[in-house]
Amino acid sequence: MGTEVSVSDLLSAIQSGKLNFCMTSATQSNSGCSAYIGFLYALLGNPDVITSENLQTPGLAEQITQLLSGVDRSSGSSDWLKDLFLTGGYDAMVNYECLIISANQELEARGEETLYVVYPYDGLSLADSPLGYVDNGDTEKEQAFLDLQEYLLSDEVQNEIQRTGRRTGYEGVSEENRDVFRTDWGIQPDRVLSP
């Protein structure tokens, strides 16, 4: 707690039998895929882009296999994984920050030990879901899109989104929502998140 953790640190903990975790399938869920890509970036030394040649790096397949050998439960959905974690007595979970917050809220309400969030400094992957519009010349649909966009970007709605444990930008959280992003759970509300 309180120290920077690398993906290599996680790998060492798995190899020594100190760490097992739940993670969604990289082929079925964005959170699992994002974690897998983050792990690859870290194991490759954080190249600008992962190339086919990078994936042929000697030892990479063995390292990623060892890393994923720490998965003791998988799921096809991030929410399902959270639910499994809450009912299964597992030790750790790789998931979205907002779902760790949600799990901790439930664990705390039940009087159980909460999770401590770890952000691997060299293997962090972000889920950024932009809203887009394809212009097909329909001004009525375009206006509906612009109205929705304005609504979603309003201060009130951005605050409501943040109250669910979801960051609405890369530069921390608002003062009024700090109680959701609890530092005693390892959450770093002031951390500028970047992959």
Model regions and ranges:
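Solvent-exposed loop/turn segments at secondary-structure junctions
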Residues: 26-31, 98-101, 122-125, 137-138
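Structural recognition of the beta-strand scaffold that forms the well-ordered cores
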Residues: 20-23, 91-96, 132
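Ligand-binding pocket segment of bilobal, Venus flytrap-like solute-binding proteins
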Residues: 41, 46-119
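Extracellular/periplasmic juxtamembrane helices and adjacent flexible linkers that interface
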Residues: 134-195
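Short helix-loop capping/hinge motifs at secondary-structure junctions, enriched
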Residues: 1-5, 41-50, 137-145
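A conserved helix-loop-strand patch within extracytoplasmic ligand-binding domains
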Residues: 1-42
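Second-shell loop/turn segments in exported
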Residues: 20-26, 68-71, 134-138
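Sec-exported extracytoplasmic/periplasmic mature domains
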Residues: 15, 39-48, 86, 105, ...
